[in-house]
Each structure stands twice: as C-alpha cells, then as structure tokens.
Amino acid sequence: ASDVYKRQDVIIGQGTSCKELIEEYGFFDHIIVPIGGGGLIAGTALAVKYFGDNCSVIGTEPLEVDDAYRSLISGKIESNSTTNTIADGLKTQLGDKNFPIILKEVKSIIRITEDEIIESMKLIWQHLKIICEPSCSLPLAGVIKNREQFLGKKIGIIITGGNVDLKNLPF
C-alpha cells in the first residue's frame, strides 16, 4: 500500500480536495501542495485544469529530498540519494502515472529547508491550531519563503495529514 499514490483512482480522488477548496473559496491565483510520491499534486493539477480558471499549481518539497524538483527540470523521473528529512511523508519516489501530469501541469516546485519546515509547522500548530505532520507544513513554508512572489495574490494551500510522532520532533 506504500505506492498507492501511483494509482490513477487515488490521483483522481486526491484531486477532490482541490475541487472542494475551489467550491468553498472560489478561484485562486495559486494552489500550493507538498510533493512526495506525486499523487496529491497530480490530482490537484487535474482539478485545477478542469475547475481552476487560470490558477497555477506549485509544489513544495524538502531541499534534501528534491527528486520532483530535479525531475521537473530534467523531464524524467530522478531518484533521491538520501531520505534525510523530518518530512517523512515526502520521502517516496515519484510515480510513473503521476509524473506526466506533473510535468505538463505544475508551474514550479519550491524547495524547503529543514528549518523552514519546522518553523512553518510551529506556525500552523500555534496560529491555526491544526496538528499537522511536518510534511504538510511545506506549502506554508513556500509562501513565507517567497512572500514577494505571492504578495497580493489569492493563495490556497492544502494541509493534509496529522501523523505526528512526538518523539521525532526537534522541539
């Protein structure tokens, strides 16, 4: 079940989170999501294509585990040489079914440092009162890191997952 993100039905199902976001809040300039195996961002990209009205999809992933970033540049699936990140939900390899969607529909990918991951997770916990896992804090970190790019824009971020192992937190 660890490669479930590669299944087309799962990719489409994950896109419903974006569809619901658009239905609830209207159109966005950008929707930002974390990238691990690529199912969520591929599903989001498909939803934006059909429901998003000129919205761009931007991915976020850990700097140390940046296979999607490198794959988007090279045009082929790249591997990681390390899985050294607190964002353990994003250590998975991109799937072959979702990569063509990512390549065609994703505008860019922002790489996030470990410190940025931790700081954005703390902000979500403290200010939104949402217990999210480190992997899910990357979209907020991407907005903070590139605040000038997003200034005056309507941004949607998808925060998923609350699987937190308190023993592994660095604070």
For the regions a protein language model found, what residue spans apply to each?
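Glycine-rich phosphate/pyrophosphate-binding loop at beta-loop-alpha junctions
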Residues: 6-104, 150-151, 155-171
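Active-site-adjacent helical/loop segments in soluble small-molecule enzymes
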Residues: 95-152
